[in-house]
Amino acid sequence: ADFCCHNKDRDAEAEIVADYVNSNVDYVFGGGAKLFENREDGRDLFKELRDKGFQTPRSWDELVKIKSGKVFAVPYPVDAPLPDERGDLLARASLKGIELLSQNDNGFFMMIEGSQLDDYGHFNDINLLMQETHDFDRTIGAIYEWAAKDGETLVVVTADHETGGLTLVDGDLKEGKIVCKFSTGGHSGVMV
């Protein structure tokens, strides 16, 4: 939403998602379907998106059948399933976006987010943080492979901050063991 929706209050989710209807975005994949329908204001944002020329698949199976055009795929009521439950969904959804966006002769810009990395840092949940990190790493690997074959694509990976103050305090390479501790439930000054 950062690149096409604007609001002074990051928690004003219902207002933020309404901005998608008038955005120039060509491909969206993610969670939050409950914010698009059965709204307090009576709007059906999926219908409004379709009226603006978007296809709005509500499942992965519907999405894979789409071969061109603008796509707004929000198949999950809230967040996507947990990393261990969703498999390589982030990589597949990202590559599907590239398949559609690369049809534009003028090129494309795409932002892919490991959206739960921040949450799991706030929760100090090392298990879910590692799952999400591995998922994001595999996704970036798939994108780099595509970009290498394409030969004309710049891939930039960045972060805005670290969350949780995760510190490695011990470990053993031979045993494949690490011991880590969180120092905060908030953001830290750790370099990313």
PLM feature segments, named:
Residues 1:
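Mobile, glycine-rich extracellular loop/lid and propeptide segments
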Residues 4-192:
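A post-motif C-terminal structural segment
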